[in-house]
UniProtKB/Swiss-Prot annotation:
It holds the Pfam family Ribosomal_L4. One of the primary rRNA binding proteins, this protein initially binds near the 5'-end of the 23S rRNA. It is important during the early stages of 50S assembly. It makes multiple contacts with different domains of the 23S rRNA in the assembled 50S subunit and ribosome. Forms part of the polypeptide exit tunnel. It comes from the Bacteria. This is Large ribosomal subunit protein uL4. GO terms for molecular function: rRNA binding; structural constituent of ribosome. NCBIfam families: rplD_bact (TIGR03953). Part of the 50S ribosomal subunit.
Length: 201
């Protein structure tokens, strides 16, 4: 299959297994959920009534004071007491096989092509790290909410995009499924397309 280059009167021959396969929604969902879960720290921790510091002595006698009965100063209803269902540190990570991860990325790229949200260009960059220059360039291409994917990290492009809302720059190695589906349009250079094919082969 072929992908038309937006800035040139030519097309790029690409693999149908990478850019023309059926969309596997269940697989993409599983990989995206796993990716988000793997980003969680899981380091929060609270103390139960058994773990907080405090005396084990009964605060006052059971009967005769007129006050509500109390057996411990560490109970959850007391200030400084333990938490009823205390959060504990836990590992939220989910294992995703390489084959599944690659399959999900192929599915996403294929769906982007089908929905005409993948824009391929011969090359893309800015001469200086100027946000104004990049904004004008994107406006000329009628692009706003866009992920720019290049073969290698372009520092000028990265710095120019840093202060633009809904614009991000990644190299092929830094791609992830969440970023690919988060933007309306994905702008990819021809060199990056070849790298993507090699990575997902």
């Amino acid at each position: 299959m072929e992908l038309v280059l937006k800035d040139a009167q030519s097309a790029l021959e690409v693999s149908e297994t990478t850019f023309g396969r059926d969309f596997n929604e269940a697989l993409v969902h599983q990989v995206v959920v796993a990716y988000a879960a793997n980003a969680r720290q899981g380091t929060r921790a609270q103390k139960t009534r058994a773990e907080v510091t405090g005396s084990g002595k009964k605060p006052w006698r059971q009967k005769g004071t007129g006050r509500a009965r109390a057996g411990s100063v560490k109970g959850p209803i007391w200030r400084g007491g333990g938490v009823t269902f205390a959060a504990k540190t836990q590992d939220h990570s989910q294992k995703v096989n390489k084959k599944m991860y690659r399959g999900a990325l192929k599915s996403i790229f294929s769906e982007l092509v089908r929905q005409e949200r993948l824009v391929v260009v011969e090359s893309f960059g800015v001469e200086a790290p100027k946000t104004k220059e990049l904004k004008a360039k994107l406006k000329a291409m009628n692009l706003e909410d866009v992920l720019i994917v290049t073969a290698e990290v372009d520092e000028n492009l990265f710095l120019a995009a840093r202060n633009l809302y809904k614009v991000d720059v990644r190299d092929v190695a830094g791609l992830d499924p969440v970023s690919l589906i988060a933007f309306n349009t994905v702008l990819v250079t021809a060199d990056a397309v070849k790298q993507i094919e090699e990575m997902l082969a």
